[in-house]
């Protein structure tokens, strides 16, 4: 959870008037990007989980990943892929706010559906989920934005320091979970890896199609592909393992596998893009 707070604080520092001005500058790109993240991605995840007949706990875990906002590291990947970084920041910020409300709604529908399909009763404490998301997502973003507004020079220095430790810390968290649940991961790696990879790749393909419908330029298309392909796995881990919500380390496993594969797939994508643009 502390890592998630740091990431959201950094996102708040990144926010600026230019980021929100991007909504007026390119509203179609913002709208289609958000549709890809908030609507299309959960549909893909549900389809993947259903087709692969995931167990209820893994079904919920994969859906949880798909309902989370874009990952903050997507801004860095957009820059590396020579995308529209301002659009990336805008989509990440807006999706982080919107999913405060869409995540509980979608997960409530999913929990009922999974219960009906499996016969296993799943209770989702929506109120606690909403409160935790406000505390872990919205409040740190707000504090980061206010810190940047009133102490801009100090904010830039803090950003440089935290940016260097945030991503390694996230990977360390994933590895710690990996070690704690290594037997479960080894036993289920084939299906978990396949489901996570399928979610990422199908999401990237669909977002590429969406961006082509919008007739965007290459930088905008690449940004939308990355934004839809990179979700905030840390938030999914925090929700799944929270003692106030699901209190299930096993439910966090799809997010852990997703985080590892997401970086491999997106780094490969960025490498191919940079080769193409040479």
For each feature predicted by the language model, list its residue ranges.
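Alpha-helical transmembrane segments of multi-pass small-molecule/ion transporters
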Residues: 1-278
